[in-house]
Amino acid sequence: MNTASDIDYARYDHIRPILWTGDALQLLDQRKLPFVVEHVVCHDSDEVAAAIHALTVRGAPAIGIAAAWGVVLAARDVQAADGAHALQQLEPALQRLNASRPTAVNLAWALARMRRCLNAAGADWKAKLEAEAQAIAEEDLAANRHMGALGAGLIEAGSGVLTHCNTGSLATAGFGTALGVIRAGMAQHRIARVFAGETRPWLQGARLTVWELQQDGIDATLIADSAASHLMKTGAVQWVIVGADRICANGDTANKIGTYQLAIAARHHGVKFMVVAPSSTVDMETVDGSQIEIEQRDPGELYGVGGTRTVAEGIAAWNPVFDVTPGELIDAIVTERGVILNPTPENMRAAFGG
């Protein structure tokens, strides 16, 4: 049986995108990677919200963790007898944080958890609030390591895998979700080849994922997003492994734009499709993917690469950031609570209630 203790974390888990210093939040600026390693320092909640919206920090779990620390920063100048009274003053800041990225359910989940903490806290509410943010981060790291072992256990030795976007340490408290499974699979000699799609338009695969794997000494092969179907046809890939920003009650999964087409291609070519995400990403109140708000970003993000314009003036662009993969195209959903094979409303309820 695979366990998280089988993995050499000194080798496979040393990148940290979020650092709480005690009076400020340091965020590794993921817009500048891989060529510039630089941190943005946030001193208040509005700076955290701006960093989330600007993709300084990204990845659903990391967004939730950053938002939790944003609440701690917002509380610094608030004077209140207990947490419930403090919450009344903090609510505008929480709403601004919540509006920074609407699709990722982890953001709303983390803020709801901070609200519950405040409502239950007495005069020591500031200390309780900081401890809650720290707990969210620590629990995410532990969950990622456990998911890594669970997901790796599904993969046969010698397999090739394809991943999309960035789901590693940069997107979480550490180790990663889908990339955590890949790290665990490499450590246990189950995965022989790793392929990563470039992930237009922000190139999270090209800029972040292959860089992360390089830091761990894992060889990865970058492909154009449009090459994925042909890669599967060659037989080089046995699993597509992705993360999630929201998982619905029927297994429908919102993730980075381009995920849906990978799932369609995988099913056509007999390639297995795995979604890896913490249970905080599961939204049992959302019945199916049709109810998910899909974030639309500035069309200008499609007009160039690396600051160089590649498109003629006067061209329209459509730039949804996420798409929804139907649950029937997913072979396994892996959370820290366990593995759901071939997700349906029934086995999702059995795993998560609702």
From Swiss-Prot:
Keyword Amino-acid biosynthesis among record annotations: yes
| Highest taxon above the source species | Bacteria
What EC number(s) would the UniProt record show?
5.3.1.23
Which residues are noted in the entry as substrate-binding? R58, G59, A60, R101, Q204, N255, K256
The residues annotated as the active site are D245
Output the Gene Ontology terms for molecular function: S-methyl-5-thioribose-1-phosphate isomerase activity
Q: What InterPro entries has UniProt attached to this entry? A: IF-2B-related, IF-M1Pi, IF_2B-like_C, Initiation_fac_2B_a/b/d, M1Pi_N, NagB/RpiA_transferase-like
UniProt GO BP: L-methionine salvage from methylthioadenosine
* Catalyzed chemical reaction(s): 5-(methylsulfanyl)-alpha-D-ribose 1-phosphate = 5-(methylsulfanyl)-D-ribulose 1-phosphate
List, alphabetically, the SUPFAM superfamilies matched.
NagB/RpiA/CoA transferase-like
State the UniProt keywords alphabetically: Amino-acid biosynthesis, Isomerase, Methionine biosynthesis
Q: Which Pfam families match?
A: IF-2B (PF01008)
Pathway annotation from the record: Amino-acid biosynthesis; L-methionine biosynthesis via salvage pathway; L-methionine from S-methyl-5-thio-alpha-D-ribose 1-phosphate: step 1/6
Site described as Transition state stabilizer, positions? C165
Report the NCBIfam families cross-referenced here: eIF-2B_rel, PRK05720.1, salvage_mtnA
Q: What job does this protein perform?
A: Catalyzes the interconversion of methylthioribose-1-phosphate (MTR-1-P) into methylthioribulose-1-phosphate (MTRu-1-P).
Instruction: Name it.
Output: Methylthioribose-1-phosphate isomerase
Say which species the protein is native to: Stenotrophomonas maltophilia (strain K279a)
Phylogenetic lineage: Bacteria, Pseudomonadati, Pseudomonadota, Gammaproteobacteria, Lysobacterales
Encoding gene (name): mtnA
